[in-house]
Amino acid sequence: LEKEQQSTRKLKHLLILLSRLLALTALIFAFAQPQSKNGEGQRSGKPALLIYLDNSFSMTAIGTEGTLLSEGRELAKRMLQTVSPATRVLICSNALNHVEQRFQTKAEALRYLDQIESYALTRTLDDVLSWQQRQIKKHQELKEKLGQIKQVFISDFQQSQARLEQQKPEANQSFFAYQLKAQQNQNAYIDSIWFAKPTHHINTDQMLMVRVQNFGTQAKKRLELNIKIGQIKRTMFMQIDAGAEQIASFPYKEINNGSVLCQAHINDQQIHFDDTWYFSYEVPDQTNIYLIEEANSSPNVAKAFAVEERYKVWKTLPGQVSSTALAETDLIVLNGLDEIPSGLREDLITAHQNGQRILIIPGEDITFNDYNPLLRELSLCELGAPQANALNLQRINDADPFFSGVFEKKQQKWNVPMVKKAYSVLNATNSSATPLLIARSGQALFMRSNTTAFLWTTALQPSFGSMVNQSLFPTILLRCAEFASQRYPNYAILGKDAQIKVRASHSNEAPLRFISAETEFIVQYVGTPNNLRLQIGGTAALERLKAGLYELKGIETLAQIALNYNRIESQLKLLSKSELIDLLESNGIKNCNFNQIKEGQSLTAIVLKESNSYWRL
């Protein structure tokens, strides 16, 4: 009996132990998510190799065996030599265009790798993975089933690429990351340029600012910076601490006229795509002003513009406005109108959308239902009933670019009586308009919306005060006209800006082209009267256009356009192995092999074996 009881207890203990082992095994399997080669996870079909070769500008950094891009190209070729002839190959770069959507033979893939050059657009990991998944799905739906799928990513893996949404790879997909590292993680580059004054006129003083960044751990003791502004050339040498920036200033007197082609250039040894910043501007011969006023409007507006010959003023009544004249003008001024006819209001909105600047000076008894719809469209504050309390000028927003170069020193608080009455501002807190003259009550007496629309909140008639007798009044009117003379931006950025707005007329008789010494490109555009929206965000533009200065030409030259590369990869901040693996695993990619290449790709063994995921403790 005792032996039977011992046997029973022993069997009971064994059963308990077995059940615990089975439970533990189940837990391990649940967390590990194992992949079976003989079950549902294994598919029959042709093997596939997908290679992403990062060709963004950071890959132009110098590695042990040339640029990182050339090393990556050779690494991809070596991978292709290891696969069987039956393997379906898909090569993609940052272009992700229609050419790269097709699976190729090994021979075709090798030829295509030689065609991949630097590209102005960067891609995130999510961009590439999602695009590859779509191509895999489409190929299997339209062509054939795929067996084992290996996806290879060759890149320096910038932190700017570190965006990834949740992925759901199939069991037959495995992933391989090859990180190429430059010899030096150093880069000096031109970050941006700007002018002390936002407008340009012949024989006036101007100052160019150039900001240079020094990324890395080594100081720059004698970095050469060369400046060319039309006929003006300057050189200086900069000292920049490691990880610091410096702003160089170049004062000059404007001796150029018409279109002015410019560039700033540094001599850096590591990466070169960001060593030059191109820009352009116009010194106009004439600015056209269209003055819409009533018979009783203040004559002081026209007198203010008459002090300089370059301002050509055309006057008209509200009922006689020409749409053609509106389209051809630089600055439209509404002077003292009480009513704005609906047709004129629509023409003004269209003109503003086409790039014309608008200055509004209200009449002394305005119809708010005429004014406020227009003000809303121009992103200006709406006006309410006149008020007369605390309207002494207290502050000038002299830090705003509108007043750049106007005052020699910072303006202190004022308490100057300028007007007796002003229209109240109804929606100041919800408006994006910028107040430039502020009364003691906090109300804006003058404001702007960007640099395209300007509004006085007081009328010029004597019942509202003596604004026309203040020295600020003609100064502000002339500054509005100066802003109106700019027809196109100083520069645009490839890979960031989708379009460039140019105020110019173009006939469809000839194609619209970007022309430089190296290339000629027919540009896509959307045209309205005296306004062109040039499309530079498409695949064709990004593949053909390089950073530089371009003549915009139809039948005749319309503008000089400066294009620059995006500086998003100028700071060489790389993902570490743990950061990359954690990013992938947290978003569903749990079987990625990581390889880092520091001493040249030719010394790196190519091992594209399946990798299984394990439960990470």
Write out the residue ranges for each language-model feature.
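An amphipathic, basic-hydrophobic helix/alpha-beta surface used to engage anionic
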Residues: L1-P85, C92, W277-Y278
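DG-centered beta-turn motif at the end of beta-strands
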Residues: L27, L53-S56, N94-L96, Q132-H139, ...
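Short, charged loop segments at secondary-structure junctions
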Residues: M59-I62, V99-S130, L180-N185, T287-N288, ...
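Acidic, S/T/G-rich, low-cysteine, solvent-exposed domains in lumenal/extracellular/periplasmic regions
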Residues: Q159-Q173, A177, N296-R487, K546, ...
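Intrinsically disordered, low-complexity Pro/Gly/Ser/Thr-rich segments with frequent PxxP/GP/PP motifs
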Residues: G230-I255
